[in-house]
Amino acid sequence: MTTAYRFDNLWSLRAPHERVYAALADVEDYDHWWLQVREVHRIDGERARVRIRSLLPYTLDLVLTRAVQDEARGILRVDVAGDLQGWSAWQLSAEGADTRARFSQEVQVTVPMLKRAPSAIRPLLRGNHAHMMRSGERGLRKYLT
């Protein structure tokens, strides 16, 4: 089974670009509005340890390292290490008074148990991610109001 995953999600948010960018840049606050983000602990000025659990009975343990933080271009990108290896990024664009936030992620699973899982569970892992992203969008919308 391949252990590589690529995700692309688009959120439409009724909030100005600056507020959305500030909320997404503040990883330490994710667990206040994103239910699946269970814990966030800052390691230093560039890194945070994040524990994530969606529907499946497994908690991902990740270290996110800031790679790009460019508000003028609306880009946030982190390198991902731990149970997943790769990167995640937000690309924001203003649409009038609203903001579009595109989340992109390319990761490899590093957890031996998940690496050995049959390809039949790939749809479950994708569904788990989709649920987490829908919940995050709802949480951020509420947080921004």
Locate the predicted segments by residue.
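Hydrophobic ligand-binding cavity/cleft-lining segments
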Residues: 1-45
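Hydrophobic/aromatic beta-strand elements that line small-molecule binding cavities or substrate pockets
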Residues: 9, 37, 62-68, 87-94, ...
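Short loop segments at secondary-structure junctions
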Residues: 15-17, 70, 95-97
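Glycine-rich portal/gate segments that line the openings of hydrophobic small-molecule binding cavities
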Residues: 31-32, 41-87, 100, 135-145
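Beta-strand/loop substructures that line and gate deep hydrophobic ligand-binding cavities in soluble
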Residues: 80-135
